[in-house]
Amino acid sequence: MGKITSIEVQKRNVNRVNVYVDEAFTFACDAELIYKQGIQKDSVIDVEAIKEIVKEDEFIKCKNSALRTVEKTYKTEKELRDKLTEKGFEEDTIKRAIEFLKEYNLLNDEKYAEMYIKDRLRSQGRNKIKYALIRKGVSEDILLDKLSNIDTEDENDTAFKLAEKKYNILKKKESDKYKLSQKLFRFLLSKGYDYDCCNSIVRRLTNNEYME
């Protein structure tokens, strides 16, 4: 047990305070916690209460860090967890912060996948999109659901437009039709389109049957 002898607002951050017990600096925390916990000068505090305050303060810092992160750019749960881990927060604290954001729909992998797919379909095929979302930690169930909604005809039309633009650039530099076809095919594959789609488009643009 000890007696709180001083509570001082920090000079560099007015939202945080330094708490002194028996004239010695003991801990710093968010000013909000002082009011929530009913802490005031001359009150008595024990070690367990201090530990609880420090733990809650860590959660507030983690939560605020998470909020700042998603304000800058939308994240998947895995991406946010990795960011918070890099900053040194404990797993239990990170879990609480993530649950807080999910409660207010500020973290939603399903919504993220929808937005990501809609944006990337303008320049990528479903295979590249799929593997990118896997790396971002989106679950298989969400992936299967969202990728199944992609309109194959629209995807193929986009692939053709990209290939046509690339073809017009390549044909100025490559006179060998076979090599040109190979380069165009690899270009489409790198964009995430499947074999049949790539083959069909290359044949349409070059009249080259080598893929068959």
From Swiss-Prot:
InterPro entries: RecX_HTH_1st, RecX_HTH_2nd, RecX_HTH_3rd, Regulatory_RecX, WH-like_DNA-bd_sf. Disulfide bonds: none annotated. Keywords: Cytoplasm. Signal peptide: none annotated. GO terms for biological process: regulation of DNA repair. Its main location: cytoplasm. It is found in: Cytoplasm. GO terms for cellular component: cytoplasm. Pfam families: RecX_HTH1, RecX_HTH2, RecX_HTH3. PANTHER family: REGULATORY PROTEIN RECX FAMILY PROTEIN. Belongs to the RecX family. This is Regulatory protein RecX. It comes from Clostridium perfringens (strain ATCC 13124 / DSM 756 / JCM 1290 / NCIMB 6125 / NCTC 8237 / Type A).
